Amino acid sequence: MKRKGFIKQIFGVTADGRVEQLSELHIPAGTRVVQSFLISTLFEDNGASFKKVILPNSVKEIEHAAFANIRAEQVLFKNGLEKIDGYAFRGVGIRSENLVFPKTLKSIGHYAFAENRIPKFSQDNSLKKVTLPQNCEYYKDSFDPTTEVVGGKLIEE
């Protein structure tokens, strides 16, 4: 069965498995779901580092650990995104002072942005502040304890 809107291939990996140094990772337009472990499996072991990860407005969901442990200084979320599953961006090292999410975002899973530290300065939390739409549900552990969360609805467990 052919599934439309799923990433099938990412360019930038050489035939022998090395990653070409990419400054930006663009998820293809039309992609609706970034599957679990997809990006992290392709790039984590290769030491890839990106200035930006750019998601098109067609992406509705980012599944469990899709981007976990890759390096990306900035992630650009577009309107249309509704759900970020647990561990999706765990350990990514986003260096944004204020990460703003689209108004369409409804939920952020457990540990989605946890352990988001710059590797050279492991005690420094690089994600200082996040701004969520008022209707977006998140957990206390969705972000590191030192990250300021503005907006959203905290789910008490």
Label the model's feature ranges.
Residues 1, 5, 17-33, 44-61, ...:
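Structural signature of tandem-repeat unit edges
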Residues 12, 63-65, 69, 85, ...:
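Short, intrinsically disordered, low-complexity terminal segments
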Residues 11-14, 35-40, 66:
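Surface-exposed repetitive/solenoidal architectures
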